[in-house]
Design a protein with these regions (language model features):
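ATP-binding/phosphotransfer module of carbohydrate and carboxylate kinases, centering on a glycine-rich
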Residues: 1-58, 62-67, 71-127, 131-132, ...
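Short glycine-aspartate micro-motif
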Residues: 79-83, 133-137, 201-205, 211-213, ...
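Short, small/polar residue-rich loop motifs at catalytic or cofactor-binding pockets
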Residues: 87-88, 207-209, 229
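Short, intrinsically disordered, charge-biased short linear motifs at domain edges
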Residues: 227-236
């Protein structure tokens, strides 16, 4: 029975993923999913009964009767997602399509502690509750354990050591909570909205810190302890500035020093060098740039990264700034909740 439940859930997720891209017919679903027409019919009937899909119009296909179009009922299920930076909390409400319906932003005091954070999170969430809400996702500063919901030693946050944040948030909110690194939720956002077109990608988040989210063969890569992506704390300059992590010469520290001193060209070149190393190491074909530093100077960061990437014709890499803007981490945290119910394993 568990295997049957898994198969149903997987097939449902495949069909819903295709429906997120626009109206589709049952024939489209069978051709694009690899499922049999009989399996598609069963899945579609189940999703219609659950209010997730609706029949909406027809499409003429030449000879024969028109085919019925199926449309995702995007607002049938909702989720909240939060981005926690070292100085700000952002909460967004998203639907099944990954569209942001509402948002709230509040400053966080210097060196905020867990009780103060949970209180502010609860205040913002209470202002955005909805009967169709499935849960709350948190995109937090690492290192943390995605599986246990514990924040271990959040870089730059001195009062966050082995904090059971998921448990604290669930107790306060009375809702299911999912915790992950901010870089991971950001890449989840891109993968959720793009579906199968995004398979091997890195998302570079340049905000108060610097890290990457990794999508490898269509799956978010978290590593053995769910802390993959701490790329900002790899060394790029042996005699470089001290970093908040305690080391010296980290990519994050060198970048931030250049940015604070007004050396935009130097800051973007450092990010470009780091991204080029990732591309060479992982052989990804897509790079997404995100975070407040990038959004403040998008063209400069795009140029800085593109200038450092390999130029071989057989090694094309697409580089872009996230279309989700400031919401990418929080929206991805919400989509992580949605994927727990209606997505493939991420």
């Amino acid at each position: 029975m568990p295997n049957l439940r898994f198969l149903r859930g997987y097939n449902d997720a495949v069909v819903l993923g295709l429906a997120r891209s626009g109206a589709v017919t049952r024939v489209d679903l069978a051709e694009r999913s690899g499922l049999t027409p009989q399996a598609v019919s069963k899945v579609v009937a189940r999703l219609i009964d659950e209010g997730l899909l609706v029949e909406s119009g027809t499409r003429n296909v030449g000879v024969g009767k028109p085919r019925t179009l199926l449309k995702l009922v995007a607002d049938s299920r909702l989720a909240l997602g939060a981005q926690v930076e070292r100085d700000e909390l952002r909460v967004v409400l998203t639907d099944l399509a990954g569209d942001v319906l509402d948002r709230a932003v509040a400053p966080l005091p210097p060196d905020f502690d867990p009780p103060a954070f949970v209180a502010e999170l609860t205040r913002l969430v209470n202002g955005m509750r909805d009967d169709k809400l499935l849960g709350v996702g948190l995109g937090f500063v690492g290192p943390l354990d995605h599986r246990t919901g514990v924040v271990h030693d959040a870089t730059g946050l001195v009062k966050w050591h082995d904090v059971p944040l998921r448990e604290l948030a669930e107790d306060s909110l009375g809702l299911p909570v999912v915790l992950d690194k901010d870089t991971n939720t950001a890449i989840v956002a891109e993968a959720w909205r793009r579906g199968e077109e995004l398979r091997d990608a890195v998302l570079v988040l340049v905000g108060t810190g610097l890290g990457v989210g990794l999508l490898l063969d269509g799956q978010v890569y978290r590593g053995a302890r769910t802390n993959a992506g701490e790329f900002g704390h790899t060394t790029i300059q042996l005699d470089g500035p001290e970093c908040v992590c305690g080391r010296t010469g980290c990519i994050e520290a060198v970048h931030n020093l250049a940015a604070r001193s007004g050396d935009l060209a130097g800051a973007t070149a450092i990010v470009g060098l780091a991204v080029a190393d990732l591309v060479q190491l992982l052989d990804v074909d897509h790079v997404v740039l995100a975070g407040r530093a990038v959004l403040a100077q998008p063209e400069a960061y795009l140029a800085g990264v593109r200038a450092k990437l390999p130029t071989a014709d057989w090694l094309p890499v697409e580089v872009e700034v996230t279309p989700l803007g400031d919401d990418v981490v929080a929206a991805g945290a919400a989509m992580l909740v949605l994927s727990e119910f209606y997505g493939r394993p991420r």
